[in-house]
A protein has these predicted regions:
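Non-transmembrane, aqueous-exposed alpha-helical and coiled segments at domain scale
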Residues: 2, 6, 10-13, 24-49, ...
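Conserved phosphate/anionic-ligand binding catalytic regions in large, soluble enzymes, centered on
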Residues: 9-27, 286-306, 348-356
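Alpha-helical support elements that line or immediately flank enzyme active sites
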Residues: 20-35, 304-315, 360-368
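Short, mixed-charge aromatic SLiMs
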Residues: 42-57, 89-96, 252, 326-338, ...
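C-terminal regulatory domains involved in ligand/effector binding and gene-expression control
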Residues: 75-262
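Accessory "access/gating" subregions that flank catalytic or transport cores
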Residues: 211-343, 347, 456-463
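Hydrophobic alpha-helical bundle architecture
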Residues: 327, 333-406, 418-427
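Extended hydrophobic packing segments that form well-structured cores
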Residues: 427-463
Length: 463
């Protein structure tokens, strides 16, 4: 199945695509796909979380996301300002309205179970949903009338045990003008047709949904990216979760704005702008704000930061921003198809590493790079994230995640710049680097795969 722009760039809420966006969609899907008439028979729903969802779900807001999903909410539509009040009401009344149609008894502390011992075979991020019938005997509710296991495999994608791939087939994919499963195949298309990568990818997207819909979606993603940055640099205070992490983006942005009028500014200060854009996005994400998976929430700041840099400092026009995202989405799709974008599966190399590769390729494309230079930019960025662990402090998407996005964005700019200094010839193909990421992730201990059982997560300072 072709992974398109709309698959990769999902508008949703923070703090995690795999632990928030995915579980919300999964809870809703469980109820939506029940047999006709069964919803009215339900007296209670429960969910059991496994693996990384169990270990860090509370810090990532998985419990909140599941309750919203049971209520029928979607990540791109839910009113973020209403979430806290709705969750408080559910806890107080011990009742939840399934899809807004059927109220049943629900106790979050009892009906959301965190299984810290067992792992299911398909993926670490597993959820087993159970619905129980309207029996008068409480003991009888131990036998569910419906049960289904769903997996949140990164970037907001969800899959059940019977699906070979995520999502529903769109149909007509055999007529995709330029199908590809590797960068090598994409480069062959470009060489044969004498077209830049963005034109190939634009043709694919147009074949899926038409020119107007593709352009509209790209504009919506860009607007959401930049709105998130603007909101992040304007919002002060502490982030939720208990680590008492202070938002830094507003102060950094103020300092940079003041310094802009000064004559003697060190050239490297432009990197501070790139960094503050990324930090702003990830502080918004940590606070549960509206973000876009790029390719995940944990790495949501890299692509918009470099995109904003392209607009503000490189004078890239709107069409160039579209080119940026088209190319970035292809690189992200390859990382997902041939390795993983899930921190619970391959560590942070799959999240910030993939995001940096996407951003580097996108920036190179927007600045007029050849197809080979674009591939080189992506490979450089990904190569220098290989082996990066996912070990969030207290299970929150804050430390080291927020700063890591800033550094990842800077590395993406450096990778694109370095690639543009060459002629496109390079030693390591992107496809091989992605395979190295997959192999590295397979060998990585589960302590470093979004479980908060190792690394920085167990070496916090004593306060």
């Amino acid at each position: 199945m072709y992974i398109s722009l709309t698959d990769l760039f999902k508008i949703g809420i923070g703090p995690s695509s795999s632990h928030t966006v995915g579980p919300m969609r999964a809870a809703r899907r469980f109820l939506m796909e029940l047999p006709d008439g069964m919803l009215s028979q339900i007296a209670r729903v429960r969910v059991e979380l496994f693996g990384s969802l169990a270990h860090t779900g509370q810090g990532h807001g998985t419990d909140v996301a599941i309750q919203l999903g049971f209520c029928g909410e979607l990540p791109d539509e839910v009113d973020t300002a209403s979430i806290a009040g709705r969750i408080a009401t559910i806890a107080r009344e011990q009742s939840i309205s399934l899809l807004g149609q059927k109220s049943v008894r629900f106790q979050p502390l009892l009906d959301i179970r965190y299984n810290l011992k067992d792992l299911l075979p398909l993926h670490s991020n597993a959820m087993t949903f159970r619905a129980y019938g309207a029996f008068s005997d409480e003991a009888a509710t131990t036998t569910p009338i419906a049960e289904r296991t769903l997996y949140s495999i990164g970037g907001g994608f969800i899959v059940d045990e019977d699906e070979a791939f995520v999502g529903s087939p769109r149909g007509g994919e055999a007529t995709m003008p330029y199908p590809f499963a590797s960068m090598a195949e994409l480069l062959v298309h470009g060489k044969r047709e004498r077209l830049p990568l963005m034109d190939l990818l634009r043709a694919n997207e147009h074949a899926l949904r038409g020119t107007a819909a593709t352009t509209s979606f790209l504009d919506r993603v860009i607007d959401t990216f930049f709105t998130c940055i603007d909101r992040g640099i304007a919002t002060r205070g502490e982030l939720p979760g208990g680590l008492n992490v202070k938002r830094r983006a507003p102060d950094i942005h103020h300092q940079l704005t003041v310094e802009r009028g000064q004559r003697r500014i060190a050239p490297h200060k432009v990197l501070d702008w790139v960094s503050v854009y990324a930090i702003a996005v990830n502080e918004e994400n940590a606070a549960g704000g509206r973000v876009v998976t790029a390719p995940t929430n944990g790495a949501a700041g890299v692509v918009p930061a470099v995109l904003r840099y392209a607009r503000d400092f490189c004078d890239v026009e709107p069409e160039g921003l579209h080119d940026f995202l088209l190319v970035a989405s292809a690189v992200g799709a390859l990382c997902k198809m041939n390795a993983s974008i899930s921190g619970a599966e391959v560590g942070c190399q799959g999240e910030v590493g993939s995001a940096a590769a996407m951003a580097a390729a996108g920036l190179a494309a927007a600045l007029g790079a050849s197809n080979e230079q674009i591939e080189n930019a992506a490979e450089i960025a990904l190569e220098h994230h290989l082996g990066m662990t996912c070990d969030p402090a207290a299970g929150l998407v804050q430390v080291p995640c927020i700063e890591r996005n800033g550094i990842g964005a800077i590395k993406a700019v450096a990778a694109a710049s370095l690639a543009l200094r060459g002629d496109g010839s390079h030693f390591m193909p992107l496809d091989n680097c992605i395979e190295a990421m997959r192999q590295t992730g397979e060998e990585m201990s589960t302590k470093f795969k979004e479980t908060s059982l190792g690394g920085l997560a167990v070496n916090l300072p004593e306060c």
